[in-house]
Amino acid sequence: MRVLLILVSLAALAHAESFLKSKTGYQGVQTLPGFIGGSQPHLGGGIGGGRPFISQPNLGGGIGGGIGGGKPFIPQPNLGGGIGSTRPFPRPQYGDYGSRNSCNRQCPSTYGGRGICCRRWGSCCPTNYKG
């Protein structure tokens, strides 16, 4: 499948190049020595005829915004998860109460002995929840 895609791409490129060569005034794209990267001078087709011009680098104006266009930066709302955030039940600890065998075991005294180890392989919940 990839080979077929590459062949189709090469055929389209060859067709486009032959189409451009049939147009009057086509000079082609020439790169000058000493320019490495994406901002090489291009000859022909620029403003004012066939004078060379330096192409501007892409600064991220595509999808997602960035410098030079696109969407402005909009900060996301704080969804928690930072320092001091609270959870409806403690994060599962994969230690003393973290195996399938201990899931029906009573919770330690920090929960007042009310909770049962929940969430299959998780830790103890402060409520009598078993799931």
Curated annotation (Swiss-Prot):
Its main location: cytoplasm. The modification Lysine amide is found at K130. GO terms for molecular function: chitin binding. One of its GO terms (cellular component) is cytoplasm. It is found in: Cytoplasmic granule. Residues 1-16 form the signal peptide. Coiled coil: none annotated. Strongly expressed in hemocytes, with weaker expression in gills and epidermis. Expressed at low levels in hepatopancreas. Keywords: Amidation, Antibiotic, Antimicrobial, Chitin-binding, Disulfide bond, Fungicide, Signal. Disulfide bonds join C103-C117, C107-C124, C118-C125. GO terms for biological process: defense response to fungus; defense response to Gram-negative bacterium; defense response to Gram-positive bacterium; killing of cells of another organism. Antimicrobial peptide. Has strong antibacterial activity against the Gram-positive bacterium C.glutamicum (MIC=0.4 uM) and the Gram-negative bacterium E.coli (MIC=12.5 uM). Has weak antibacterial activity against the Gram-positive bacterium S.aureus (MIC>50 uM) and the Gram-negative bacterium P.aeruginosa (MIC>50 uM). Has antifungal activity against S.cerevisiae (MIC=12.5) and C.albicans (MIC=6.3 uM). Has weak antifungal activity against the mold B.cinerea. Presents chitin-binding activity. This is Hyastatin. It comes from Hyas araneus (Atlantic lyre crab).
